[in-house]
């Protein structure tokens, strides 16, 4: 492959190649050298875009957050209340994590990412601000408890996805409502159960 093939899109080509490696073997396999080899460029070629592995992993994380948030935003378009938007967002996050476990794990490895990078911090802060507005708008939430409720919600979603990925939980439905377990848990946390706050369609039990 000629070195000029990418015509300025080498960075994206490297990210594409790195994501393929990530999906196949996990974060341990994503190195500058392996990514360059997968992209059919010299080992030195990535240096202009990603000076080290942390920079490459951070760029991958930004890509993955963008993908996950895009899916969540699409799901939220059908929601009409804060509770419905929260459930739709959480459902989309769970679906993404279960579909792409290696990507999901890597996205939260702040010990391996550069969280001072504006692109990463901006997308994460925007994600929390968006759902935080919906949490604060819940009838059951007082303004001075909204942050605690947001942290609880984030912890519930992340913990559930992580335990599903690691095989600690299996796909199951709530015994009382018949809804996917994670939907029932989120509704219980935000006080949406029996208040019309649940999204009408939940594909699959998790």
Where are these regions (language model features)?
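Helix-turn-helix
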Residues: 13, 17, 21-55, 59
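Amphipathic C-terminal alpha-helical segment
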Residues: 154-172, 188-199
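Amphipathic alpha-helical packing segments from all-alpha helical-bundle domains
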Residues: 114-140, 147-152, 176-191
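Amphipathic alpha-helical linker/stalk segments
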Residues: 2, 62-86, 121-133, 137
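Amphipathic alpha-helical segments used for helix-helix packing
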Residues: 98-115, 162-170
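N-terminal intrinsically disordered/low-complexity leader segments
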Residues: 1-9, 20, 79, 194-206
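Short hydrophobic clusters on alpha-helical segments that form packing/core surfaces
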Residues: 14-22, 30, 64, 68, ...
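Hydrophobic alpha-helical connector segments
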Residues: 59, 73-102, 126, 149-153
């Amino acid at each position: 492959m000629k070195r000029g093939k990418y015509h300025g899109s080498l960075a994206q080509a490297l990210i594409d190649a790195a994501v393929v490696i990530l999906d196949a073997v996990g974060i341990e396999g994503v190195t500058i050298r392996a990514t360059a080899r997968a992209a059919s460029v010299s080992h030195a070629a990535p240096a202009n875009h990603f000076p080290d592995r942390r920079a490459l992993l951070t760029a991958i994380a930004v890509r993955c957050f963008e993908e996950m948030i895009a899916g969540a935003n699409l799901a939220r378009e059908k929601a009409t209340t804060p509770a419905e938007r929260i459930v739709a967002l959480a459902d989309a996050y769970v679906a993404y994590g279960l579909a792409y476990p290696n990507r999901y794990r890597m996205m939260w490895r702040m010990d391996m990412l550069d969280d001072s990078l504006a692109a990463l911090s901006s997308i994460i802060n925007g994600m929390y601000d968006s759902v935080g507005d919906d949490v604060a708008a819940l009838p059951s939430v007082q303004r001075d408890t909204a942050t605690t409720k947001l942290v609880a919600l984030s912890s519930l979603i992340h913990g559930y996805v992580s335990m599903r990925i690691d095989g600690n939980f299996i796909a199951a439905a709530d015994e009382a409502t018949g809804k996917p377990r994670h939907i029932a848990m989120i509704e219980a946390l935000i006080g949406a159960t029996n208040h019309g706050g649940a999204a009408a369609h939940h594909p699959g039990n998790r």
